[in-house]
Amino acid sequence: MCGIMGAVSERDISKILLEGLRRLEYRGYDSAGIAVIDSQDRLKRVRIQGKVQNLADAMQETAIAGNTGIAHTRWATHGKPSEQNAHPHLSHGEIALVHNGIIENHEHLRQQLITYGYQFTSETDTEVAAHLIHYHYQQHENLLLAVQKAAAEMQGAFALGVIHQKRPEELVAIRKGSPLVLGFGIGENFIASDALALRSFAQSVIYMEEGDSACVTTQDIKVYDSNRILVQRAVHPLNSDSEIVNKGPYRHFMLKEIFEQSKVITDTLESRINSIDVLRASFGEKASHIFPMVKNIHIVACGTSYHAGMIAKYWLESLAGLPTQVEIASEYRYRDVVVPDNTLFITVSQSGETADTLAALFKAKQSNYLASLAICNVATSTLVREADCVFLTRAGIEIGVASTKAFTTQLAAFLMLAAALCKDNRAQEVLRQLQELPACCERVLQMNEEVESLASLFVNKVHALFLGRGVQYPVALEGALKLKEISYIHAEAYPAGELKHGPLALVDKDMPVIAVAPNDELLDKLKSNLHEVSARGGQLFVFVDDSQNWKANGARLIKVPSCGAWLAPIVYTIPLQLLAYHVAVAKGTDVDQPRNLAKSVTVE
């Protein structure tokens, strides 16, 4: 959840570290800090509560410069957001350390270190790592070995970046369950949680593998495997791309990403839907052998990706006739799962580094599944490397914490999967509709001003209720999630048919009720449910197919351009994204970086 940046260079790296943190801020923004070794081999540190800009302001007031350093932006796990708990953490003024992840046995290690005479100044598990590395350095005077030995004692999933004032020419990194990237520059080398942070500085990168440690200097990067054996890892070119971090004409990244959906869906579909055979090949070389044997499907994901899986269940069961079970990854990994014969295991993740999703995949690989399939947006992610089959969405980098374009490209991928597994001519109709999807999205985006006009009606609301039926129920769930994430309005979603089983008790004149009402086989049923809301005086907002003649009966009707039935869940998602965005803007919340959240959930 936190962002790590580090560099060893022939030049001052303070501004490089700061720019890297700006690109990692999506991973956490409770506090930030930097530590460098200056020209006199002194360890200098600046920490601040709040966002990276606060750190930049503090650095203006403090002369901090050096050729070796580490920096960090934090999402709080152990210890409240504060300067005291911010990284980097020090040990004896000699070692500085940044950390992403959780050290599960930190309490035991803390007590052990106290008996050795170490004193703690923070509430974090990270300070335990700093002191433990210092302890081992005292024994061996080898920073790499000290980090390796300390990591062997620590339980959990984490990544570390470490410097020592007596070793000003080197930076040590280790990965154990949390992603870390090594970057090669000219006269300088780097570490980072995400290659995005290195795009302006590094020419190529190594994606550290599980258990890897590395010693980074200006001249070289040496990588060691989990057995501390020097190894060669694949080096990948890194293309600079300034557009990825620019909002362009948009006020927020989230709005930019909403409006990019037509393009990224086009990119995701490109060269994949020419025919069913071509489509099946898009899921990897093994897919042609695996797909004919599939009898059941398990989908495991978190958050927005879980909602994508719920929608996929309707498509896969309807089109492919395959029993499909959808699980929340954090629940799946801790229960006994019955795996029927010939079950395909599917994981979905934007980043491919979501901790619970990865743990679920590792569990599945030890179970009796036919094969695993990853639907992911990051080609170099752990999820992609570990799965048997892969479908890469082409959403591009998503900066806004609330996922938009990553979600709709996941849905496009799932609809393609359902078509690939379909055994009758309905697959051709799905392909035809998919070809129309980008244009449908463009038409829906033209609703922006109309949806914006609704925002003032929600600004002072405390609660909201979203309703849908059938495949639109997960769409309602996603709409509720978006609203609560960025506007901080408590929002729930229910199947409309469940109104009488509890949620109707919440409905009164102050409760906005948002319904998703495409022209499908459940429309008449949904209308009956909405009459129940109107009869109780609820404030009803209904997103309806513009080809239908609705009687408002006091409801606010928002007409959505008609689209093919298979596309409706994707198309109706977009106005709900716009609604959440404009309500958040009207309330003055931080749209791209909502409180208490982070983009990439790399801790349990």
Swiss-Prot record:
<dbReference type="GO" id="GO:0006002">
    <property type="term" value="P:fructose 6-phosphate metabolic process"/>
</dbReference>
<dbReference type="InterPro" id="IPR029055">
    <property type="entry name" value="Ntn_hydrolases_N"/>
</dbReference>
<dbReference type="Pfam" id="PF13522">
    <property type="entry name" value="GATase_6"/>
</dbReference>
<dbReference type="InterPro" id="IPR035466">
    <property type="entry name" value="GlmS/AgaS_SIS"/>
</dbReference>
<keyword id="KW-0808">Transferase</keyword>
<dbReference type="InterPro" id="IPR005855">
    <property type="entry name" value="GFAT"/>
</dbReference>
<dbReference type="GO" id="GO:0006487">
    <property type="term" value="P:protein N-linked glycosylation"/>
</dbReference>
<dbReference type="InterPro" id="IPR001347">
    <property type="entry name" value="SIS_dom"/>
</dbReference>
<feature type="domain" description="SIS 2">
    <location>
        <begin position="454"/>
        <end position="594"/>
    </location>
</feature>
<feature type="active site" description="Nucleophile; for GATase activity">
    <location>
        <position position="2"/>
    </location>
</feature>
<dbReference type="Pfam" id="PF01380">
    <property type="entry name" value="SIS"/>
</dbReference>
<keyword id="KW-0032">Aminotransferase</keyword>
<comment type="function">
    <text>Catalyzes the first step in hexosamine metabolism, converting fructose-6P into glucosamine-6P using glutamine as a nitrogen source.</text>
</comment>
<keyword id="KW-0963">Cytoplasm</keyword>
<dbReference type="InterPro" id="IPR047084">
    <property type="entry name" value="GFAT_N"/>
</dbReference>
<feature type="domain" description="SIS 1">
    <location>
        <begin position="279"/>
        <end position="427"/>
    </location>
</feature>
<feature type="active site" description="For Fru-6P isomerization activity">
    <location>
        <position position="599"/>
    </location>
</feature>
<dbReference type="InterPro" id="IPR017932">
    <property type="entry name" value="GATase_2_dom"/>
</dbReference>
<keyword id="KW-0677">Repeat</keyword>
<dbReference type="InterPro" id="IPR035490">
    <property type="entry name" value="GlmS/FrlB_SIS"/>
</dbReference>
<dbReference type="GO" id="GO:0004360">
    <property type="term" value="F:glutamine-fructose-6-phosphate transaminase (isomerizing) activity"/>
</dbReference>
<feature type="domain" description="Glutamine amidotransferase type-2">
    <location>
        <begin position="2"/>
        <end position="219"/>
    </location>
</feature>
<dbReference type="GO" id="GO:0006047">
    <property type="term" value="P:UDP-N-acetylglucosamine metabolic process"/>
</dbReference>
<dbReference type="GO" id="GO:0005829">
    <property type="term" value="C:cytosol"/>
</dbReference>
<dbReference type="GO" id="GO:0097367">
    <property type="term" value="F:carbohydrate derivative binding"/>
</dbReference>
<keyword id="KW-0315">Glutamine amidotransferase</keyword>
<comment type="subunit">
    <text>Homodimer.</text>
</comment>
<protein>
    <recommendedName>
        <fullName>Glutamine--fructose-6-phosphate aminotransferase [isomerizing]</fullName>
        <ecNumber>2.6.1.16</ecNumber>
    </recommendedName>
</protein>
<dbReference type="GO" id="GO:0005975">
    <property type="term" value="P:carbohydrate metabolic process"/>
</dbReference>
<dbReference type="InterPro" id="IPR046348">
    <property type="entry name" value="SIS_dom_sf"/>
</dbReference>
